Amino acid sequence: MFFRLRFLVFFVLFRNLCCLLLSGDLFRVYGLGFNLGVMIALQILVGICLSWFFFRCIIPQNWIFTLLIHLEFDLGFIIRSLHIIFTSLLYFLLYIHIIKVIFLCLIFDSSMLVWFFGFLIFIFILIIAFIGYTLPCTSMSYWGLTVFSNILATIPLIGIYICQWIWCSEFINDFTLLKLHSIHIFLPFVLLFLIGAHFFVLHYFLSSDGLLDRFPFYYERFFFFLLYYLRDLFLIINILCFLIYYICIYWFFVFHEESWIIVDTLKTSDKILPEWFFLSFFGFLKSVPDKFMGLFLLFVLCFALFLFILNCILIFIYCRSSLLWMSLSLVLFYYLCVGGFLSLYVVLCFPLWMEIQFWVLLLFCFIVCRLD
């Protein structure tokens, strides 16, 4: 039995990683999924290194945040900066990946299972990133967790119980961080399983063909093992070299000013501004005065991606009116995301130049790698 199971596992890996025939008309943008997988693997590896020292920073002294972790062991601050920058880069690549697959879905048919696992991966990444955002226990993350947990308390019937389960008390304390830390460690391994399922289903249905594959005169095929591995690795190596250089020179650009303030439970922060990849969701929560309606709009935003699964079902039953679902989901997800992102920056007057210079250089790195 063990031999058969081992043979099945190696056969699936060999088929999906080595012997898969893909189109020769795949641009470098198609390698964003591979880059996302590498970034998630690096995030988990760096997070495991940080988790060994998290308890030592939190338990002995109340509300001592992990920005001082560089005093505990060598290279601790560099590892923490890598973990934070990898998160920003992960979301940057993730949003580009979603734009790419929406474009492909507007042109070609897509598999329902591929979209389903991709939707679950997106939701899990959101949950893991928000929990990780609250773990450093800075002034910004503490009040951000307080605001979001109070919003969850507005859910009818079960909201107050969810809030008390998260807090483990009448207020946020050390045990709250320990529980969130355990969840933050457990969920990435579930995410790896979903990524494996997404990877297998994608290669099984071959739902990301090139543009020229729809024409009968184009038959060029290549093995996945050598050509596309080298192209994807070249892109990810350029990105990692750029990030390491940026950390060594401008290591402070990933932190807001409130990230250096120790938590004062009796004083609210002057402004509560999450990371850039949470700005659209934060804008939905704050767009209406009622907390429950803001939470409802947040679920509508996440449900916009789920509409693509309905689109795949409608295509499967040959209902061409599915373009309505695609248009609705595109408007809900991206126009509202960009609107919430820009409105928060305009209202809060946050200085953009620190982050703009990073993303401009990153786009330059993509141009150097040639997206062809």
Curated annotation (Swiss-Prot):
Residues passing through the membrane, by range: 32-52, 77-99, 114-134, 180-200, 228-248, 297-317, 330-350, 351-371
Predominant location: mitochondrion
GO cellular component: mitochondrial inner membrane
Membrane topology field: Multi-pass membrane protein
Any one Gene Ontology BP term: respiratory electron transport chain
InterPro entries, A to Z: Cyt_b/b6_C (IPR005798), Cyt_b/b6_C_sf (IPR036150), Cyt_b/b6_N (IPR005797), Cytb/b6-like_sf (IPR027387), Di-haem_cyt_TM (IPR016174)
Cofactor note: Binds 2 heme b groups non-covalently.
Pfam families in UniProt: Cytochrom_B_C, Cytochrome_B
Positions bound to heme b b566: 97, 198
Domain of life: Eukaryota
Subcellular location: Mitochondrion inner membrane
Sites where the protein binds heme b b562: 83, 184
GO function term, MF aspect, one: electron transfer activity
Binding site for a ubiquinone: 203
UniProt KW keywords: Electron transport, Heme, Iron, Membrane, Metal-binding, Mitochondrion, Mitochondrion inner membrane, Respiratory chain, Transmembrane, Transmembrane helix, Transport, Ubiquinone
Cofactor(s) required, per the database record: heme b
The keyword Nucleus appears for this protein: no
Function: Component of the ubiquinol-cytochrome c reductase complex (complex III or cytochrome b-c1 complex) that is part of the mitochondrial respiratory chain. The b-c1 complex mediates electron transfer from ubiquinol to cytochrome c. Contributes to the generation of a proton gradient across the mitochondrial membrane that is then used for ATP synthesis.
Oligomer and partners: The main subunits of complex b-c1 are: cytochrome b, cytochrome c1 and the Rieske protein.
Similarity comment: family membership: Belongs to the cytochrome b family.
UniProt miscellaneous comment: Heme 1 (or BL or b562) is low-potential and absorbs at about 562 nm, and heme 2 (or BH or b566) is high-potential and absorbs at about 566 nm.
Protein's name in the database: Cytochrome b
Organism (species): Trypanoplasma borreli
